[in-house]
A protein has these predicted regions:
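Adenosine-phosphate binding glycine-rich loop
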Residues: 35-147
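A structured beta-alpha segment of the ubiquitous adenosine-cofactor-binding alpha/beta core
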Residues: 1-30
Length: 147
């Protein structure tokens, strides 16, 4: 690794970038530097660490971009597994929990990819995650009789 005094880590030449800190930390300017340096994949590990403009720059450049609402879901999923374990007064092994989490994350990936393809945006994980999220909320609203 290399430290660049006075610059963000987004100025390093990397294949994969993982913004995992604060909202809007990775800007359009940062995205353009990453793209120029040959980044192949950006996977968010926080809630919206990339600005909308940065996400659009990645899309335009053909960079594989995984939005936090999908790629960062592991923490929320693990909390849900912990609540389930506690409610059942059970004790799960690390391997059992890890396997359940892997299943959840694989399902999120597959659902986002399939939904994007179904709606004519194959490979667009942002579109797949957004449409999937909208459908889940809409189905819940309808199931509750609110519409």
């Amino acid at each position: 690794a290399e430290f660049l005094r006075g610059k963000t880590p987004w100025h390093l030449k990397v294949d994969v970038a993982l913004p995992c800190a604060t909202q809007n930390e990775l800007t359009e300017e940062d995205a353009k530097v990453l793209i120029a340096n040959g980044v192949v994949c950006v996977a968010e590990g926080a809630n919206m660490p990339s600005t909308i403009e940065a996400a659009k720059a990645f899309e335009k450049a053909g960079v594989l971009y995984a939005p936090g609402k999908a790629s960062n879901a592991g923490g929320v999923a693990t909390s849900g597994l912990e609540m389930q374990q506690n409610a059942s007064r059970d004790s799960w092994s690390f391997d059992y929990t890890e396997n359940k989490l892997a299943e959840i994350m694989a399902n999120i990936h597959d659902t986002c990819a399939q939904t994007a393809e179904e709606y004519g945006h194959a490979g667009d994980y942002v579109m797949g995650a957004n449409i999937t999220g909208f459908i889940k909320v809409a189905d819940a609203v309808i199931a509750q009789g609110l519409i």
